[in-house]
């Protein structure tokens, strides 16, 4: 994959960059693995705004992704590499030997025609899924479970990979993309390799309309709102905030930790790197 740049033939083209989609081998998705998505506009069941900056965007269908990889011992052939509008990574369509079809995240190096499998006895090969206890130390992995059998929850975005650093007792020590060192049960499964679409981080949206197509609404500064809408709002003309920077709900915004304590904190060996 590469990033395409354009000559500035218009203001909208001046800064915009696109993926060249060279790795995509099939345009139409597998219909049996599609589900409709109902847009929420960031509202909950009561109709109240709970997530800002969401709404609009192009209509999408959800691709059902196999995050559990629980068809052990049955080989699958990669039929195609496809675009998924719901995530930054590409997805791969697998045709299993028993006739079933499933989507998985497409790692770097996975090509059409390659055979992949899952289970404790699978080979250490890109795209194969195994329990952490069966993966050699030092291997790069993605699509990692936090609880055995629950399905992968970590390291799923484009270009992401974690490294298996050590094994001790019933836990494996993983270095996550954030720099965090975390213990995960060795019975949890992970997929060998790095998530594909490596150049995703280098793509520039470039214009407001493209954000709207993606379902991202504008971010408005609190300073330009009215006092009823934001603690920073109001005043005559341009003026300072007049208080410590705050969220729209009045909580301190700069440098205040918002993460609550969890029982699983004991499994974090080292916190993530500071930005």
From Swiss-Prot:
Disulfide-bond pairs as recorded: none
Pfam families found in the cross-reference section: Ribosomal_L2, Ribosomal_L2_C
Region Disordered, residue ranges: 222-275
One example GO MF annotation: transferase activity
GO BP, sorted A to Z: cytoplasmic translation
Superkingdom classification of source: Bacteria
GO CC entries: large ribosomal subunit
UniProt keyword terms in alphabetical order: Ribonucleoprotein, Ribosomal protein, RNA-binding, rRNA-binding
Matching InterPro entries: NA-bd_OB-fold, Rib_uL2_dom2, Ribosomal_uL2, Ribosomal_uL2_bac/org-type, Ribosomal_uL2_C, Ribosomal_uL2_dom3, Ribosomal_uL2_RNA-bd_dom, Translation_prot_SH3-like_sf
Keyword RNA-binding (UniProt): yes
Functional description taken from the UniProt entry: One of the primary rRNA binding proteins. Required for association of the 30S and 50S subunits to form the 70S ribosome, for tRNA binding and peptide bond formation. It has been suggested to have peptidyltransferase activity; this is somewhat controversial. Makes several contacts with the 16S rRNA in the 70S ribosome.
UniProt similarity note: Belongs to the universal ribosomal protein uL2 family.
Quaternary structure annotation from Swiss-Prot or TrEMBL: Part of the 50S ribosomal subunit. Forms a bridge to the 30S subunit in the 70S ribosome.
Protein name: Large ribosomal subunit protein uL2
Gene it is expressed from: rplB
């Amino acid at each position: 994959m590469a990033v395409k740049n354009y000559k500035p033939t218009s203001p909208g083209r001046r800064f915009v960059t696109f993926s060249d989609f060279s790795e995509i081998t099939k345009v139409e998705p597998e219909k049996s693995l599609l589900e409709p998505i109902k847009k929420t506009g960031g509202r909950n069941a009561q109709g109240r705004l709970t997530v800002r900056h969401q709404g609009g965007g192009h209509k999408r269908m959800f691709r059902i992704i196999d995050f559990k990889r629980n068809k052990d011992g049955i080989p699958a052939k990669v039929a195609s590499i496809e675009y998924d509008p719901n995530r930054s990574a590409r997805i791969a369509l697998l045709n299993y030997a028993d006739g079933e079809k499933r989507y998985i995240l497409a790692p770097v190096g996975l090509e059409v025609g390659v055979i992949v499998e899952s289970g404790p006895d699978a080979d250490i090969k890109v795209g194969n899924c195994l329990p952490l206890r069966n993966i050699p130390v030092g291997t790069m992995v993605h699509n990692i479970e936090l609880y055995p059998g629950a399905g992968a929850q970590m390291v799923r975005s484009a270009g992401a990979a974690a490294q298996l650093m050590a094994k001790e007792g019933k836990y494996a020590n993983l270095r996550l993309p954030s720099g965090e060192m975390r213990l995960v049960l060795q019975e949890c499964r992970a997929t060998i390799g790095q998530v594909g679409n490596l150049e995703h981080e280098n793509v520039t949206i470039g214009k407001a309309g493209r954000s709207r197509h993606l379902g991202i609404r504008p971010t408005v500064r609190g300073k330009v709102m009215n006092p009823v809408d934001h603690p920073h709002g109001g005043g005559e003309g341009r003026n300072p905030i007049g208080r410590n920077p705050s969220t729209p709900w009045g909580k301190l915004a700069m440098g205040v930790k918002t993460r609550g304590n969890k029982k699983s904190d004991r499994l974090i060996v080292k916190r993530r790197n500071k930005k």
